[in-house]
Regions:
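Amide-donor transfer/coupling interface in amidating biosynthetic enzymes
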Residues: 1-120
Length: 120
C-alpha cells in the first residue's frame, strides 16, 4: 500500500497485503511524464511487493486512483482474499475502506480537491 489516505485503503494497516492477482497479460503502463504527475498527486495507490511484479507493470504499479479519488483501478483481486480459509483475508481492508468512505468516515476527495494532475 503506497497511499493509505484514500477511500480504498484507509483501513489497510498491514503491509504488504497478500492479495492474489489472476491475470497474465494485463499490466499497467504510462509514460514517464504521466507517472511523475501521478506520483506527485498520490494517485499510485498500490505497488507489487519486491519480486512480485510478474507481468512487468511499470514502476511496480498494482493499483491507481483518478485525481478526484473516487475511481480505483487495480490488478489484484481483493474479492479473492476475504477469508483465511482460502489463504488470506487481506482484501477485506479494501472493502472496509470503501464502506468507511460511503458512510462518511473518509473523504472521497484527495487533499488537493482533485484539481491537479493527470487523468487516469
Amino acid at each position: 500500500v503506497v497511499e493509505r489516505e484514500t477511500a480504498f485503503t484507509s483501513a489497510c494497516e498491514k503491509a504488504p497485503l497478500s492479495i492474489p492477482a489472476k491475470h497474465s497479460w494485463g499490466r499497467y503502463y504510462a509514460d514517464e511524464q504521466t507517472l511523475a504527475t501521478m506520483r506527485a498527486n498520490g494517485q499510485v495507490v498500490l505497488r507489487y511487493a519486491a519480486g512480485e511484479n510478474f507481468n512487468g507493470s511499470v514502476d511496480d504499479i498494482a493499483g491507481v486512483r483518478n485525481e478526484q479519488g473516487n475511481v480505483f483501478g487495480l490488478m489484484p483481486h481483493p474479492e479473492h482474499a476475504v477469508d483465511e480459509l482460502t489463504g488470506s483475508a487481506d482484501g477485506l481492508c479494501i472493502f472496509a475502506s470503501m464502506r468507511l468512505a460511503v458512510e462518511g468516515h473518509h473523504s472521497l476527495t484527495p487533499p488537493d480537491g482533485g484539481q491537479a494532475g493527470a487523468r487516469v
